[in-house]
């Protein structure tokens, strides 16, 4: 029995990467009875039949999983936003951060296209960078050519996804990370049958000692399962202060003696972050129930 990681799922086959090789595997029939559906990113136990084929015997417990794109065991999410074209939006950034925080995945902010920004725009981005770093987020600021070595070092030994709205430079970042790995990935590319006209599915691509999920279309924000009471846990700077609130169930909105609101008034929490928290909180409260 071998252990490996699913790096692609297509037409009932699961491509498992183990010890430098890729095996085309099927899942055992009892998976359906147990209501288990293997995902890209799953760590699995499998048995080989020959040099290229095998059967998945078991799926290890998951650290986390996204629904769209369907990927499991993600260590970090690289959230790409552009400084300009389109302009950087803290509202959009905070919404992406909430979507990732609620899945217990470490978010990393990457601000692209700095070479196209004016001096005043660069100064404003620097202010935002300081604010997000003070919260505890890692922030990369890149030009047209991303600092791929720094990002590759960051990804090393991890499984990452890249997300962001269209036009912000996700493809540029992904291609720059993958450009010098042609020889390393030749075997995997051949095994997966990648080509110019191959239909794009979620798959993990080796980047140094880590993997990056090539997730076409990962630009939407979903929080159907997020409850108003748990939103504050997606804002680390608020979670750190909630013990100072007078009321145990304080949601930092209309309650008196709120430590979070006091921190906002003292400029210890960015006003725009609190504003976005309240906006999202109201959206969650006003959300129509699903049956």
Curated annotation (Swiss-Prot):
This is Small ribosomal subunit biogenesis GTPase RsgA 1. It comes from Listeria monocytogenes serotype 4b (strain F2365). Its EC number is 3.6.1.-. One of several proteins that assist in the late maturation steps of the functional core of the 30S ribosomal subunit. Helps release RbfA from mature subunits. May play a role in the assembly of ribosomal proteins into the subunit. Circularly permuted GTPase that catalyzes slow GTP hydrolysis, GTPase activity is stimulated by the 30S ribosomal subunit. Keywords: Cytoplasm, GTP-binding, Hydrolase, Metal-binding, Nucleotide-binding, Ribosome biogenesis, RNA-binding, rRNA-binding, Zinc. Zn(2+) binds at residues 245, 250, 252, 258. It comes from the Bacteria. GTP binds at residues 112-115, 164-172. Binds 1 zinc ion per subunit. Belongs to the TRAFAC class YlqF/YawG GTPase family. RsgA subfamily. Its main location: cytoplasm. It is found in: Cytoplasm. GO terms for cellular component: cytoplasm. Monomer. Associates with 30S ribosomal subunit, binds 16S rRNA. The keyword RNA-binding applies. InterPro entries: G_CP_dom (IPR030378), NA-bd_OB-fold (IPR012340), P-loop_NTPase (IPR027417), Ribosome_biogen_GTPase_RsgA (IPR004881), RsgA_GTPase_dom (IPR010914), RsgA_N (IPR031944). Its cofactor is Zn(2+). GO terms for biological process: ribosomal small subunit biogenesis. Residues 63-221 form the CP-type G domain. GO terms for molecular function: GTP binding; GTPase activity; metal ion binding; rRNA binding. The keyword GTP-binding applies.
């Amino acid at each position: 029995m071998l252990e490996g990681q699913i790096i692609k799922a297509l037409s009932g086959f699961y491509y498992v990467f183990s010890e430098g090789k890729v095996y085309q595997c099927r899942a055992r029939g009892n998976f359906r009875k147990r209501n288990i559906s293997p995902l890209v990113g799953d760590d699995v136990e499998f048995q080989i039949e020959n040099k290229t084929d095998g059967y998945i015997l078991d799926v290890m417990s998951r650290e986390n999983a996204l629904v769209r794109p369907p990927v499991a065991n993600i260590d970090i999410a690289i959230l790409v936003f552009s400084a300009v074209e389109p302009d950087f939006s803290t509202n959009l950034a905070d919404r992406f951060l909430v979507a990732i925080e609620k899945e217990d995945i470490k978010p990393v902010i990457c601000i692209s296209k700095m070479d196209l920004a004016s001096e005043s725009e660069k100064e404003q981005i620097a202010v935002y960078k300081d604010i997000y770093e003070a919260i505890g987020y890692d922030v990369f600021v890149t030009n047209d050519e991303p600092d791929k070595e720094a990002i590759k070092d960051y990804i090393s030994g991890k499984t990452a996804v890249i997300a962001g709205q269209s036009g912000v430079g996700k493809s540029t970042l992904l291609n720059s990370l993958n450009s010098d790995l042609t020889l390393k990935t030749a075997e995997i590319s051949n095994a997966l049958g990648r080509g110019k006209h191959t239909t794009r599915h979620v798959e993990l691509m080796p980047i140094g000692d880590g993997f990056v999920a090539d997730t076409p279309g990962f630009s939407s924000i979903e929080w159907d399962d997020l409850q108003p009471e748990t939103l504050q846990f997606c804002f680390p700077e608020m979670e750190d202060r909630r013990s100072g609130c007078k009321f145990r169930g304080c949601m930092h909105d209309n309650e008196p003696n709120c430590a979070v609101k006091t921190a906002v008034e003292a400029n210890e929490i960015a006003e725009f972050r609190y504003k976005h928290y309240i906006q999202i909180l109201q959206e969650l409260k006003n959300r129509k129930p699903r049956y």
